[in-house]
Amino acid sequence: MAQQNFQPALAHVLSHEGGYSNNRADPGGPTNKGVTQRVYDGYRKGKGLAKRSVKSITMDEVGEIYDRQYWDAVKGDLMPDGVDYVVFDGGVNSGPGRSIMWLQQALRPIYTGPIDGVMGVGTLAALKAVNNNDALIDRICDARMNFLRHLGTFPTFGKGWTARVAEVRAIGKAWATGEKPQAANFVDGGQAKALVEDAKAAPSTAPADAATGAGASGLGLSGYLYDLQNQLSPLSYTSEWIGKVVVVVALASAVLAIGGLGYRWFANRRAKRLAEALGTAPA
C-alpha cells in the first residue's frame, strides 16, 4: 500500500479506536482516537506547544501522530497491500515494535533473523519473498491473538480485542487480494492498549523444586522422606507399626516425586508457550 492509501487505512484504525476513553483497567490511560495522553504530551512538547488534555486533540494532530509514530515506524510505504494495514493497526494497539515482531514470527522460516521488532533489511527481504500475502496476514493475526491471550488484561478486554483482530484480518485480506474491504466497527474493549507489560508471569517451578529437590538445596521433600524411609527400614522387622510407617513414607515419597516432576513439566510447557507468544523463544 502506498503513502496515498494511508488515509483509508487510518480511517479503519480510527473506527476501531473510537473516541475518548479513560478506563482504569486500560494501561494506556486517558486516550482519544487511539492517542494516549502520554503520546500526545510528547507530540506537543516536540512542537514546542503547551500540554493540554488529549480530549482537545485535533484531527490534523491525529493524522500527523499516526503518520509519523505508527505508519512510518512500521514502514507502511514499503509493505504490500493489506499487510501494511494489518501491521499498522497492530502497532497502534500494541506498539510498532510489537507489531513488527508478529510480522517477523509470521515470516518464519523465510525470515531467519531475531524477533526484535526492527523493520530492517532482513525483515523486508523476507517480506518480499512471500508469494501469498493472504496467508501471511492469517499468520500475523494468529500471532497477535496468541500474544493477547497471554495478557493479564485479556479477561477484561479480550472480547473487544478478538472482534477487532477478526475485522483487521478480513479487511487486510480483502486489500491483499484487491477486493473492497468491509467497514470497520467499534467494539468496546478493542481500543484498550494491549501491552507486553501486562503479560502473565511464567509459572514458578519452585513447588516442583521443593518436592523433588531440584532447587538450590538439592534435597526436596521427597528426598527427606526417602532418607527417612531408609532409616526406618531396618527397624520394620522388629515392629509391625514401623513397617506400616515405612510403606506410608515410601508411597508419600513416590507421590511427591511424581507430582513434582509432573508440575515441572507443566510449568516449563507454560513458560515455553509464553515465550513463543511474547516473541522471546529461541529461533
Language model: regions and residue ranges:
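Cell-wall polysaccharide-cleaving catalytic domain and substrate-binding groove, primarily
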Residues: M1-A254, G259-A283
